[in-house]
């Protein structure tokens, strides 16, 4: 698929999967490069016209295309996730089992802001030999490198959501991708139509743990977390609770659910101490369970 654009102002960039995401704080280093399969590069192009009040919700014309490239470097080599040799081996073995059922279908991670979609997505892509893309980063790149928060402020949420849908549509035409979606991508039925072409996984994190993480990292990059007077944790938790009440049923549309509360119970540890590797393993397990169930239903 090729991207072609022809308007007065054009932005066209080749984006590799390690360039469209922010580097995570932790590192997972694999001793071997297993599942070395063709990666993807995505072209995101857009045309920007001077803003007019009457057309403030106009979409950027995104063109996303992908072509296989033999990229030898691991997308995780620049990160730093702590994982034992046993954890890495377990992830490797489970990924090999799941691949048989996945058959190249894309995996979409959904969930509230701050739930770990990007971090887990990068590890998941590495284990499966997939390419990883973050919808928010693709949109930011397409509109000239401004942040999601700035897009919300300058163009409004509707403008952002329209382009989010366009990105999901383009990605849904591809294969062997792990996609991290925005927290609000689930509210539009058309987005589910695109994501259901692959496998969707809901990362379900207790709101208290989310609020703690987000307030620690800061809320400036979160456009839907309005600055309010009072304790930052309390106001963040209140806003997250409101968002969850609105989106909860939408998240439940996912093919599989990964509950960090359940992981914590099984491993007898606090939710906040669950590692990205442990979450990724549970994602693989839940994907496998879903696909096995789906296969058995088809056979019947």
Curated annotation (Swiss-Prot):
Keywords: Amino-acid biosynthesis, Aromatic amino acid biosynthesis, ATP-binding, Chloroplast, Kinase, Magnesium, Metal-binding, Nucleotide-binding, Plastid, Transferase, Transit peptide. Belongs to the shikimate kinase family. It catalyses: shikimate + ATP = 3-phosphoshikimate + ADP + H(+). It comes from Solanum lycopersicum. It is an enzyme of class 2 (transferase). This is Shikimate kinase, chloroplastic. Substrate binds at residues 136, 161, 183. Binds 1 Mg(2+) ion per subunit. Residues 1-65 form a transit peptide. GO terms for cellular component: chloroplast. Mg(2+) binds at residue 118. It is found in: Plastid, Chloroplast. Signal peptide: none annotated.
